[in-house]
């Protein structure tokens, strides 16, 4: 199906992780599903700028306390029919960055029912379309080992 005349939809987010044995990561509770803190880019934003803005808006966690892994960037591509675009089929690209916190931060969920910290379990299944793929990409990024921030922790 052609996407002629319709620019792709771009969104970005951050997989927030905390070192430990095992490390843990944050997911947001939408009431009916879990997801990463992410959202659509605003005009003129880079993927990273949008990811950090969405992370701050959805979690209340300041970008100042997050260390972004410069070697990890994962893109997910799929087709959507979003209401905001009149349900016309569009290509959507979601870019996910990996961010590390020194410790679990207080989360202020302003746009969601809540949040949950998950302990890292290799190849766990949470949500096939986005989360599982990102977690597998992170594990592959670390050579199949338990993720750890650069320089150890």
What do the PLM-derived regions correspond to, one by one?
Residues 28-33:
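Short, solvent-exposed aromatic-acidic interface loops
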Residues 1-25:
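Conserved N-terminal beta-strand and adjoining loop/helix that marks the start
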Residues 40-133:
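Unchanged
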Residues 124-153:
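Charged phosphate-binding loop/patch that engages nucleotide di/tri-phosphates or the phosphate backbone
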Residues 8, 24-26, 84-94, 139:
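Glycine-rich, flexible loop segments associated with nucleotide phosphate handling
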Residues 35-39:
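A short gly/proline-enriched turn/hairpin at secondary-structure junctions
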Residues 17-26, 98, 139-143:
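A generic structural signal for ordered secondary structure
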């Amino acid at each position: 199906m052609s996407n002629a005349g319709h620019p792709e939809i771009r969104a970005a987010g951050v997989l927030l992780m905390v070192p430990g044995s095992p490390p843990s990561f944050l997911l947001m509770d939408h009431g009916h599903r879990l997801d990463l803190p992410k959202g659509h880019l605003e005009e003129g934003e880079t993927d990273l700028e949008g990811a950090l803005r969405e992370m701050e808006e959805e979690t209340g966690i300041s970008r100042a306390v997050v260390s972004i892994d410069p070697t990890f960037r994962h893109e997910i591509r799929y087709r959507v029919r979003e209401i905001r675009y009149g349900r016309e089929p569009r290509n959507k690209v979601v870019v996910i960055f990996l961010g590390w916190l020194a410790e679990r931060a207080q989360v202020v969920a302003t746009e969601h029912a809540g949040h949950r910290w998950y302990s890292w379990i290799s190849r766990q299944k949470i949500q096939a379309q986005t989360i599982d793929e990102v977690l597998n990409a992170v594990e592959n990024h670390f050579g199949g080992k338990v993720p750890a921030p650069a320089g150890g922790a």
